[in-house]
Amino acid sequence: MSRNKFYDKTIFQIKRMFTDETAISILDNMQAVYEAKDSDYSATGLPMGNLRKCEDAGIEAWRGCLVRIGDKMSRLENFLKEKEYLVISEKAEDTVIDLANYAILMSCLIEEIKPPHSDYYLNLSEKAQESLVNLSYYCVFQAMLWKNNDTENGLVFLEKALSHWKPLCEYSLEMQ
Protein backbone atom coordinates (compact mmCIF):
# COMPACT_ATOMS: atom_id res chain seq x y z
CA MET A 1 0.00 0.00 0.00
CA SER A 2 1.24 3.44 -0.90
CA ARG A 3 0.75 6.65 1.03
CA ASN A 4 -1.70 7.72 -1.68
CA LYS A 5 -4.94 5.97 -0.77
CA PHE A 6 -6.81 7.15 -3.87
CA TYR A 7 -4.06 5.67 -6.06
CA ASP A 8 -4.40 2.36 -4.21
CA LYS A 9 -8.20 2.45 -4.61
CA THR A 10 -7.91 3.15 -8.35
CA ILE A 11 -5.33 0.40 -8.96
CA PHE A 12 -7.63 -2.01 -7.10
CA GLN A 13 -10.58 -0.87 -9.24
CA ILE A 14 -8.62 -1.54 -12.44
CA LYS A 15 -7.37 -4.92 -11.15
CA ARG A 16 -10.99 -6.01 -10.72
CA MET A 17 -11.47 -5.48 -14.48
CA PHE A 18 -8.95 -8.24 -15.25
CA THR A 19 -8.76 -11.97 -14.68
CA ASP A 20 -5.52 -12.49 -16.62
CA GLU A 21 -2.52 -13.00 -14.32
CA THR A 22 -0.25 -11.07 -16.70
CA ALA A 23 -2.45 -7.98 -16.36
CA ILE A 24 -2.54 -8.33 -12.57
CA SER A 25 1.26 -8.63 -12.57
CA ILE A 26 1.56 -5.47 -14.71
CA LEU A 27 -0.67 -3.58 -12.27
CA ASP A 28 1.32 -4.88 -9.28
CA ASN A 29 4.51 -3.71 -10.99
CA MET A 30 2.95 -0.32 -11.76
CA GLN A 31 2.09 0.12 -8.10
CA ALA A 32 5.58 -0.92 -6.96
CA VAL A 33 7.19 1.50 -9.43
CA TYR A 34 4.85 4.30 -8.30
CA GLU A 35 5.66 3.67 -4.63
CA ALA A 36 9.42 3.67 -5.27
CA LYS A 37 9.37 6.74 -7.50
CA ASP A 38 7.00 8.58 -5.17
CA SER A 39 9.51 8.06 -2.38
CA ASP A 40 12.46 9.12 -4.56
CA TYR A 41 10.80 12.17 -6.12
CA SER A 42 8.83 13.54 -3.17
CA ALA A 43 11.18 15.58 -1.01
CA THR A 44 8.14 17.32 0.52
CA GLY A 45 6.80 14.12 2.04
CA LEU A 46 3.54 14.61 0.13
CA PRO A 47 2.45 11.96 -2.34
CA MET A 48 3.21 12.93 -5.95
CA GLY A 49 5.62 15.67 -4.85
CA ASN A 50 7.34 15.78 -8.23
CA LEU A 51 4.00 16.28 -9.99
CA ARG A 52 3.23 19.15 -7.62
CA LYS A 53 6.49 20.92 -8.52
CA CYS A 54 4.84 22.72 -11.45
CA GLU A 55 2.64 24.54 -8.90
CA ASP A 56 5.73 26.64 -8.08
CA ALA A 57 5.29 28.11 -11.59
CA GLY A 58 1.54 28.63 -11.18
CA ILE A 59 0.54 25.48 -13.10
CA GLU A 60 -1.95 23.19 -11.41
CA ALA A 61 -0.46 19.76 -10.73
CA TRP A 62 -3.16 17.90 -12.65
CA ARG A 63 -2.45 20.08 -15.71
CA GLY A 64 1.26 19.33 -15.40
CA CYS A 65 0.38 15.64 -15.33
CA LEU A 66 -1.75 16.12 -18.45
CA VAL A 67 1.33 17.50 -20.23
CA ARG A 68 3.26 14.35 -19.27
CA ILE A 69 0.38 12.24 -20.56
CA GLY A 70 0.55 14.21 -23.80
CA ASP A 71 4.27 13.46 -24.09
CA LYS A 72 3.67 9.73 -23.71
CA MET A 73 0.75 9.82 -26.15
CA SER A 74 2.87 11.63 -28.74
CA ARG A 75 5.49 8.93 -28.43
CA LEU A 76 2.90 6.20 -28.86
CA GLU A 77 1.20 7.93 -31.80
CA ASN A 78 4.58 8.00 -33.51
CA PHE A 79 5.07 4.32 -32.65
CA LEU A 80 1.72 3.53 -34.31
CA LYS A 81 2.90 5.33 -37.41
CA GLU A 82 6.50 4.05 -37.55
CA LYS A 83 6.12 0.69 -35.71
CA GLU A 84 9.46 1.27 -33.95
CA TYR A 85 11.33 3.61 -31.63
CA LEU A 86 14.68 5.15 -32.41
CA VAL A 87 15.50 5.24 -28.69
CA ILE A 88 15.91 1.51 -28.20
CA SER A 89 16.27 1.66 -24.40
CA GLU A 90 12.54 2.33 -23.97
CA LYS A 91 10.08 -0.11 -25.45
CA ALA A 92 6.50 0.78 -26.40
CA GLU A 93 5.43 -1.49 -23.55
CA ASP A 94 7.29 0.72 -21.05
CA THR A 95 5.63 3.80 -22.52
CA VAL A 96 2.09 2.41 -22.21
CA ILE A 97 2.77 1.41 -18.61
CA ASP A 98 4.09 4.91 -17.84
CA LEU A 99 1.01 6.35 -19.53
CA ALA A 100 -1.28 4.10 -17.47
CA ASN A 101 0.40 5.29 -14.28
CA TYR A 102 0.22 8.97 -15.27
CA ALA A 103 -3.50 8.52 -15.99
CA ILE A 104 -4.06 7.16 -12.47
CA LEU A 105 -1.94 9.93 -10.96
CA MET A 106 -3.87 12.63 -12.83
CA SER A 107 -7.09 11.10 -11.54
CA CYS A 108 -5.66 11.34 -8.00
CA LEU A 109 -4.78 14.99 -8.52
CA ILE A 110 -8.27 15.75 -9.86
CA GLU A 111 -9.76 14.02 -6.82
CA GLU A 112 -7.96 16.54 -4.60
CA ILE A 113 -9.48 19.57 -6.34
CA LYS A 114 -13.07 18.29 -6.56
CA PRO A 115 -14.48 19.40 -3.18
CA PRO A 116 -14.43 23.21 -3.62
CA HIS A 117 -16.04 23.20 -7.07
CA SER A 118 -19.68 23.45 -8.15
CA ASP A 119 -21.78 20.47 -9.22
CA TYR A 120 -21.02 21.36 -12.84
CA TYR A 121 -17.26 21.08 -12.28
CA LEU A 122 -17.72 18.04 -10.08
CA ASN A 123 -19.53 16.29 -12.95
CA LEU A 124 -16.77 17.32 -15.40
CA SER A 125 -14.13 16.01 -13.00
CA GLU A 126 -15.87 12.67 -12.59
CA LYS A 127 -16.11 12.26 -16.38
CA ALA A 128 -12.40 13.06 -16.70
CA GLN A 129 -11.57 10.53 -14.00
CA GLU A 130 -13.65 7.89 -15.76
CA SER A 131 -11.76 8.63 -18.98
CA LEU A 132 -8.44 8.36 -17.11
CA VAL A 133 -9.35 4.98 -15.62
CA ASN A 134 -10.37 3.75 -19.08
CA LEU A 135 -7.13 5.10 -20.54
CA SER A 136 -5.15 3.22 -17.90
CA TYR A 137 -7.18 0.05 -18.50
CA TYR A 138 -6.53 0.12 -22.26
CA CYS A 139 -2.82 0.71 -21.69
CA VAL A 140 -2.57 -2.25 -19.31
CA PHE A 141 -4.58 -4.38 -21.74
CA GLN A 142 -2.19 -3.50 -24.59
CA ALA A 143 0.85 -4.23 -22.41
CA MET A 144 -0.70 -7.57 -21.45
CA LEU A 145 -1.19 -8.48 -25.13
CA TRP A 146 2.43 -7.65 -25.87
CA LYS A 147 3.69 -9.67 -22.90
CA ASN A 148 1.54 -12.62 -23.98
CA ASN A 149 2.83 -12.27 -27.58
CA ASP A 150 -0.74 -11.81 -28.81
CA THR A 151 -0.40 -10.48 -32.34
CA GLU A 152 -3.96 -11.32 -33.34
CA ASN A 153 -5.41 -8.24 -31.63
CA GLY A 154 -2.78 -5.87 -33.03
CA LEU A 155 -2.74 -2.40 -31.55
CA VAL A 156 -6.48 -1.92 -31.09
CA PHE A 157 -6.20 -1.24 -27.34
CA LEU A 158 -3.38 1.23 -27.87
CA GLU A 159 -5.61 3.09 -30.33
CA LYS A 160 -8.45 3.04 -27.77
CA ALA A 161 -6.10 4.44 -25.13
CA LEU A 162 -4.98 7.24 -27.43
CA SER A 163 -8.60 8.15 -28.16
CA HIS A 164 -8.87 9.56 -24.62
CA TRP A 165 -6.61 12.54 -25.41
CA LYS A 166 -9.40 14.67 -26.88
CA PRO A 167 -11.82 14.33 -23.93
CA LEU A 168 -8.97 15.06 -21.49
CA CYS A 169 -8.08 18.22 -23.42
CA GLU A 170 -11.75 19.24 -23.44
CA TYR A 171 -11.85 18.78 -19.67
CA SER A 172 -8.73 20.92 -19.29
CA LEU A 173 -10.18 23.69 -21.45
CA GLU A 174 -13.52 23.58 -19.63
CA MET A 175 -11.77 23.89 -16.24
CA GLN A 176 -10.33 27.34 -17.10
Where are these regions (language model features)?
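Intrinsically disordered, low-complexity regulatory regions
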Residues: 2-176
